């Protein structure tokens, strides 16, 4: 008996839009268990990737790494080293490295992925992901010119609107570090408009709100910064739930409130 992946993805989309983070995690764990019981390797890989990605967003990288270890062997056995499936998995593992602050490992993985994709055809979507993720690692290492170059390369080849929105958030974060706040705000507002227009309550929307909040904070517009941090926390709480990223958002919100109080006293 084969696992119904089409039904899984439909249910997962509903969970992301209508359920809280705990319910989504339980759903993913239950479905992953079903794929293992059915011994459906294709489904184990697909659902395992979604579960590991969700754990990564929650900051639970140790658990995510364990799942990636399981599915990496299955991917190599099923598709081989020079394959889009393996390249896609390496990109996901690199995301986990970035969350775990293993930036050099992430860059090495993504360079390897780029080499694999150069030997395959029809790889624009995956190559854009390489650029996006490597840009994040470069940004974390303060290699801002390389980070901006990668993200701009991604935007040149992406056609999917949602992926464009993600790339614009990433570009905005680089521009913030370069203190180009006006340009950063244009990029992140484009992303926010896309998510709100399409009623997509996703973790990426929380990231967009937090990025906007950071821009307003740097511009000393503390009330607006607070507004966007609160929106970011609401969306993150709905879609992911508790975790270190939410803790950081709350810390940033409190810092913005403190700075607003100080500004009122001056």
Residue spans of the language-model regions?
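Alpha-helical segment of the N-proximal tetratricopeptide repeat
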Residues: 6-38, 50-57, 99
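Alpha-helical repeat scaffolds
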Residues: 27, 67, 147-151, 183-191, ...
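Amphipathic alpha-helical segments of tetratricopeptide repeats
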Residues: 29-34, 69-77, 111-119, 152-157, ...
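Terminal, low-structured helical/coil segments at or just beyond the last alpha-helical repeat
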Residues: 236, 241-266
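Short coil/turn linkers that connect adjacent helices within long alpha-helical scaffolds
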Residues: 37-40, 77-81, 119-122, 156-161, ...
């Amino acid at each position: 008996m084969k696992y119904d992946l089409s039904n899984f993805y439909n249910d997962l989309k509903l969970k992301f839009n209508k359920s809280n983070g705990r319910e989504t995690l339980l759903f993913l764990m239950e479905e992953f268990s079903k794929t293992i019981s059915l011994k459906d390797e294709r489904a184990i890989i697909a659902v395992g990737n979604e579960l590991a990605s969700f754990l990564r967003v929650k900051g639970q990288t140790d658990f995510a790494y364990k799942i990636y270890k399981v599915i990496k062997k299955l991917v190599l056995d099923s598709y081989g080293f020079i394959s889009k499936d393996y390249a896609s998995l390496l990109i996901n593992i690199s995301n986990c490295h970035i969350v775990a602050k293993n930036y050099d490992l992430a860059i090495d993985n993504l360079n390897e992925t780029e080499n694999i994709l150069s030997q395959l055809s029809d790889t624009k979507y995956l190559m854009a992901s390489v650029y996006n993720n490597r840009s994040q690692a470069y940004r974390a290492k303060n290699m801002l010119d390389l980070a901006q170059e990668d993200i701009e390369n991604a935007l040149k080849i992406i056609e999917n609107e949602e992926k464009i929105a993600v790339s614009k958030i990433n570009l905005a974060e680089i521009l913030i570090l370069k203190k180009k706040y006006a340009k950063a705000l244009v990029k992140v507002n484009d992303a926010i408009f896309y998510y709100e227009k399409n009623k997509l309550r996703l973790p990426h929307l929380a990231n967009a709100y937090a990025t906007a909040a950071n821009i307003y904070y740097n511009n000393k517009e503390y009330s607006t910064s607070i507004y966007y941090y609160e929106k970011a926390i609401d969306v993150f709480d709905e879609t992911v739930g508790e975790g270190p990223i939410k803790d950081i958002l709350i810390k940033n919100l409190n810092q913005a409130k403190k700075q607003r109080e100080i500004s009122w006293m001056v």
